[in-house]
Amino acid sequence: MVRIIIVLSAHAGAGQTTITVNLASALARQGHRVLIAEKGENAKLRAWLGLAQTADNHPTSPDHTSPGTLATRIGPDFWVMGDAERIPPEFAVDYEYIFLLPAIPAGCESLLPRCDRILVCCSLEEKDTARQVIDLDQHLSSLTGSPRPVDLVVMNKINTKEWHNNLECFSLLAEYFGEERIADPLPHCERIHDLPLDSRTVWELSQENLRDAFMRLIEIIKLW
């Protein structure tokens, strides 16, 4: 059975693309059939996946998989949603995991009814992070009718020297969502930041603690 997961960003620079690529590539490495569906142009994502661009900004790849999708060099397939407002029914057969990656939350309204889970990324470098995540959840609630539609919050770019700020943000989010919906935070690390430049993933790094942080996310997703 396919699981459709929409990955949203509470603000710019929250790690939406980084988290999606590393989760999708891990599942693909484990033998799962995975698709990343792009809603709105994401140049960083396309370059990271090793997709060339045509003159009119359409991604290209030497290999096609399912009709309309492209193979990537890190494992998951890629699909440009364009104006589509739903996932083609054949994709439910072709894939086990589909990650929807809208450029902005405002572009996700038509996608929400088709999603099984909502994952929201946020950065602890941002001021009022908790408030922005809660505001996004309340906006999504107004669209879905669900009182707490966000299934998982991933705090990214945590600075281990700023425990007061980290604890305050975690406490506010845990009070609102419940601790079970707050993932273990991902550390701020230049090695992670540089991964797109080398078209690599966290699974190719030697730092076990970084791989473990993402693997804990994978374990949550596989339980959904």
Feature locations, PLM:
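Gly/Ala-rich phosphate-binding loop of Rossmann-like dinucleotide-binding domains
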Residues: A24, A28, L112
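P-loop/Walker-type NTP enzyme "switch/lid" segment
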Residues: S9-A14, R29, R33-E96, I104, ...
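Inter-motif core of Ras-like GTPase G domains
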Residues: G107-E126
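Acidic-aromatic/histidine active-site loop/patch
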Residues: M1-I4, S141, G145, V150, ...
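Hydrophobic positions on the alpha1 helix immediately C-terminal to the Walker A/P-loop
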Residues: I19
